Amino acid sequence: MKVDLFDFHLPEELIAQTPLPDRAASRLMVLDKRTGAIRHETFRNIISYLNPGDCLVLNDTRVMPARLYGEKEETGGTVEVLLLKQLDGDRWETLVKPGKRVKPGTKLTFGEGKLEAVCLDTLEHGGRVLEFSYDGLFYEVLAELGEMPLPPYIKEKLDDPERYQTVYAREIGSAAAPTAGLHFTEELLDAIREKGVHIVFITLHVGLGTFRPVQVDDVEKHDMHAEFYQMSEETAETLNRVREQGGRIIAVGTTSTRTLETIAGKHNGRFVAESGWTDIFIYPGYEFKGIDGLVTNFHLPKSTLIMLVSALAGRENILHAYQVAVKERYRFFSFGDAMLII
């Protein structure tokens, strides 16, 4: 299957650079995955499409202020470090710019010595393994010294970093936000609960691989990045009960989808409490075992994410919906509008 099958024309001005003042005021395209029929709504009206007994699955990961600016201890040369993944303890997989002169043994310092690091290893894709040292708690030091790493297609500085967090973000560890969840407010979640819809949480820490372009011609040859996930006993029990009682499981975001499909795929369609790493790659031909519907944003051409939504709703339905979205001037990507596939 050729990657070019997932291409579409997107005018640059439709890439949302800032979030709307009101999270739930985003537009919502509702796509019937069986017929391809489209309806246009406001996100707040998503509640009309949820039934008592359904279950929304949200990713409660929290984005780290993962970009650090520091200098090499020996020369004073400036460096930019992006935290990608915690390996164990204080060892992290990172991207360092400029990276060529940061070799094993190189020492780095940040915030006038409040945070220090030594390079332990060089990785295949150009990454570096750094081991950090500091006083106190790492995430408190990071909160003081780090910056929020916005996606590469967002050029404007964000006035309020909390707008790149969901209102329910709890478990710190992501390099990017699970953006489908950015549209929900506390009031909307309360109203959904009052309707009799279950709301449960999983955690998947989003890596920057989510923005990595597919660099092969054939979809099947793409090397998918791995991300850490976990599901609690309470969430697993609720999901199994919803499934047994005929309710729909609706994932909020591709990250929730990847978690649910990873677990259901391992356990014959059932959910169990577990944690681990997933590199599941979902594209057309995949048979879904965990979800019935999906809330998601509008994705980049030729990305693994547009392949995932095409697996759920059909490639032709998705590409037609995206053509309509461009014509109707929907806002695209992380700060853009949303789609509900049911």
UniProtKB/Swiss-Prot annotation:
A molecular function (GO) term: S-adenosylmethionine:tRNA ribosyltransferase-isomerase activity
Q: In which pathway does it act?
A: tRNA modification; tRNA-queuosine biosynthesis
User: Does S-adenosyl-L-methionine count among this protein's keywords?
Assistant: yes
Q: Where in the cell is it found?
A: Cytoplasm
Recorded GO cellular component terms are: cytoplasm
EC main group: transferase
Q: Which one GO biological process term can you cite for this protein?
A: tRNA wobble guanine modification
The reaction(s) this protein catalyses: 7-aminomethyl-7-carbaguanosine(34) in tRNA + S-adenosyl-L-methionine = epoxyqueuosine(34) in tRNA + adenine + L-methionine + 2 H(+)
Where it mainly occurs, coarsely classed, is: cytoplasm
Recorded hits in PANTHER family, A to Z, give: S-ADENOSYLMETHIONINE:TRNA RIBOSYLTRANSFERASE-ISOMERASE
**Function, please?**
Transfers and isomerizes the ribose moiety from AdoMet to the 7-aminomethyl group of 7-deazaguanine (preQ1-tRNA) to give epoxyqueuosine (oQ-tRNA).
- How is the subunit organization of this protein annotated in UniProt? Monomer.
Q: Which HAMAP family match?
A: QueA
What is the name of the protein in this document? S-adenosylmethionine:tRNA ribosyltransferase-isomerase
UniProt source species: Geobacillus kaustophilus (strain HTA426)
Its taxonomic placement starts with: Bacteria, Bacillati, Bacillota, Bacilli, Bacillales
Quote the gene name from the UniProt entry. queA
